[in-house]
């Protein structure tokens, strides 16, 4: 389905070409109107063309308008110096709603589906997932859902940190201090003890380094301990993924170990390596620091692994696009990785995107930590969110049974955390506040969920299980027109999210849609109205778009609150 924006862009492009035939390939810039009295969309190109054509903007606007067709508009007007405002006719909006109804079922499929790899979450073995993993996990999951929805083939990868010198240290400690480590909390505690030994005891450090060599040589005893450590950690990670409703395929750093020597050999053959302080590096003119791919002791590092992963994803997974979701602090590393992969011929420009994100802050504007200064454990944060949701339900809905509260609280709590994160621009830091994220008003998950529940209430009052999408609709009132227009902008929100890799475009859209639905609900009565069928059609579309949009954000719906 063509979006309203794309339809209008074609119409304006043709009008500009007719008005100014000597102007080559001018792409008009169309934007939604900032205020309702300016119509539905606005074209500001007359101001830009004034510099090119050496004419007054208003005269240019008048020339463009003279070439515009009457259909599908009810009003075209020139405002101010030369802004062209467009208002679509109710007949056209009704027709588009019929097309939209069908396209919504299919997912607004792209014409050329691609293989997309999204690398997200990526916790480290033997360590608790913390609040920093929250952003990577839910941003990556939302992007994966959206790319899949529009028809792309998405491979979700979890690049778990399951290799390196830290494992030699932990294996040594467990060999010398046998104990139970079937729980991640035990393992995390043991990791801290092992680190103290590694830091303060030179002999322990030597034995740890020997165990790294043993692990790389696939010594049976070292491998057995390593596998048990990984198994314990992954079970704990999966519990969190189950709570968050995350599906992701594990492919840890260790997967790429067999390819690391070949990477170094290939870079040497291509003349890309320079020895610096006994380490092998790739230097780039655009960067002040090199990309080190082999340490001075001959060992590999995460840069080597990331380069091998990039090559594998292109050559073996046949990815058309690779997206890695991590904090912004790793931006330079990924810029160097991309530059090196391009120089080595593994990657073409424009295929890789690093989706960086900002910090999660406490109410004082500092990085969210525990009182002891440690990272907040993600599992504890999620459990607290559910507890807070239970408290809110008991306060506002005292008539609910314990069973009803236990059913609804996890949905409300997890929705609140996800939406609070996704509604913030991903590159910005945001303040984590349970009090704000659980509000019924404002840009919150509860605000969206309440509108969805309202629609379920309409169905119960009418004694029906499903709203009819039998058309055609008949737009009569301003509130209906605003709701229809907003519904039709759903694919535009998806396009913006995909283009910028920022889920907040979708949250902003759903927040706006909820506002428009609430206005419609207030002003457009359904029962005993001659327009009941048409208004129920709009309710049905609003229900589907809200449910779909929330699903794409990883949120769940409820029939009742």
Swiss-Prot record:
Q: Where in the cell is it found?
A: Cytoplasm
Q: Name one GO biological process term.
A: arginyl-tRNA aminoacylation
Q: Which GO terms describe its molecular function?
A: arginine-tRNA ligase activity; ATP binding
Its main localization is: cytoplasm
Kindly list the GO CC terms recorded for this protein: cytoplasm
* Segment forming the signal sequence: none
Recorded superkingdom: Bacteria
Q: Does the keyword Nucleotide-binding apply?
A: yes
**Which stretch carries the motif 'HIGH' region?**
123-133
Q: Which PROSITE patterns match?
A: AA_TRNA_LIGASE_I
Q: Which stretches are annotated as coiled coil? A: none
Catalytic activities: tRNA(Arg) + L-arginine + ATP = L-arginyl-tRNA(Arg) + AMP + diphosphate
EC no.?
Answer: 6.1.1.19
- CDD domains, A to Z: ArgRS_core
Q: List the disulfide bonds.
A: none
Class of the enzyme per the UniProt entry, highest EC level = ligase
User: InterPro entries this protein is in?
Assistant: aa-tRNA-synth_I_CS, Arg-tRNA-ligase, Arg-tRNA-synth_N, Arg-tRNA-synth_N_sf, ArgRS_core, DALR_anticod-bd, Rossmann-like_a/b/a_fold, tRNAsynth_Ia_anticodon-bd
Which SUPFAM superfamilies did the record assign? Anticodon-binding domain of a subclass of class I aminoacyl-tRNA synthetases, Arginyl-tRNA synthetase (ArgRS), N-terminal 'additional' domain, Nucleotidylyl transferase
Q: Which PANTHER family match?
A: ARGININE--TRNA LIGASE, CYTOPLASMIC, ARGINYL-TRNA SYNTHETASE
Q: Which family does it belong to?
A: Belongs to the class-I aminoacyl-tRNA synthetase family.
Name of protein: Arginine--tRNA ligase
What lineage is on file? Bacteria, Pseudomonadati, Chlamydiota, Chlamydiia, Chlamydiales
């Amino acid at each position: 389905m063509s979006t309203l924006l794309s339809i209008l862009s074609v119409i304006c492009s043709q009008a500009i070409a007719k008005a100014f035939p000597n102007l080559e390939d001018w792409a008009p810039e169309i934007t939604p109107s900032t205020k309702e009295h300016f119509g539905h969309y606005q074209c500001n190109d007359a101001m830009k063309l004034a510099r090119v054509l050496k004419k007054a903007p208003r005269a240019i606007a008048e020339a463009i308008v003279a070439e515009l067709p009457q259909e599908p508009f009810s009003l075209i007007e020139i405002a101010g110096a030369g802004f062209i405002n467009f208002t679509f006719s109710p007949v056209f909006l009704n027709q588009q709603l019929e097309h939209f109804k069908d396209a919504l079922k299919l997912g607004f499929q792209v014409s050329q589906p691609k293989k997309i790899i999204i690398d997200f979450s990526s916790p480290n073995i033997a360590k608790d997932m913390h609040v920093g993993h929250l952003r990577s996990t839910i941003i990556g999951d939302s992007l994966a859902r959206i790319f899949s929805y529009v028809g792309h083939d998405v491979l979700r990868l979890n690049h778990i940190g399951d290799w390196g010198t830290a494992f030699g240290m932990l294996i040594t400690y467990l060999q010398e201090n046998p104990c139970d480590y079937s729980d991640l909390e035990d393992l995390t505690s043991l990791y801290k003890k092992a680190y103290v030994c590694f830091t303060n005891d030179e002999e322990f450090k030597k034995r740890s380094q020997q165990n790294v060599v043993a692990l790389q040589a696939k010594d049976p005893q070292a491998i057995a301990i390593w596998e048990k450590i990984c198994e314990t950690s992954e079970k704990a990670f999966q519990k969190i993924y189950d709570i968050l409703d995350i599906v992701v395929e594990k492919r840890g750093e260790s997967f790429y170990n067999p390819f690391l020597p070949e990477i170094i050999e290939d870079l040497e053959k291509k003349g890309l390596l320079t020895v610096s302080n006994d380490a092998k590096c790739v230097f780039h003119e655009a960067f002040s620091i090199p990309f080190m791919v082999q340490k001075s002791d001959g060992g590999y590092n995460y840069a080597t692994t990331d380069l091998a992963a990039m090559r594998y994803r292109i050559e073996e997974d046949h990815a058309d696009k690779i997206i890695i979701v991590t904090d912004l602090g790793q931006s330079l590393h990924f810029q160097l990785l991309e530059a090196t992969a391009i120089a080595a011929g593994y990657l073409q420009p424009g295929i890789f995107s690093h989706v960086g994100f900002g910090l999660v802050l406490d109410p004082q504007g500092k990085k969210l930590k525990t009182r002891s200064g440690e990272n907040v454990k993600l599992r504890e944060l999620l459990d607290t969110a559910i507890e807070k949701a239970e408290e809110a339900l008991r306060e506002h809905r005292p008539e609910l049974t314990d069973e009803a509260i236990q059913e609804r609280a996890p949905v409300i709590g997890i929705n609140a955390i996800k939406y609070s994160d996704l509604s913030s621009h991903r590159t910005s830091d945001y303040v984590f506040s349970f009090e704000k994220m659980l509000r019924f008003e404002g840009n919150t998950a509860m605000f969206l969920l309440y509108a969805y529940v309202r629609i379920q209430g309409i169905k119960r009052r009418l004694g029906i299980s499903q709203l009819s999408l039998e058309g055609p609709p008949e737009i009569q009132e301003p509130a209906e027109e605003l709701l229809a227009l907003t519904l039709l902008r759903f694919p535009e929100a998806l396009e913006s999210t995909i283009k910028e890799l920022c889920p907040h475009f979708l949250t902003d859209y759903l927040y706006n849609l909820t506002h428009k639905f609430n206005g419609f609900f207030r002003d457009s009565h359904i029962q005993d109205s001659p327009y009941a069928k048409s208004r129920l059609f709009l309710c049905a579309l609003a229900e589907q778009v809200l449910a779909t949009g929330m699903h794409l954000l990883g949120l769940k719906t409820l029939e009742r609150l």
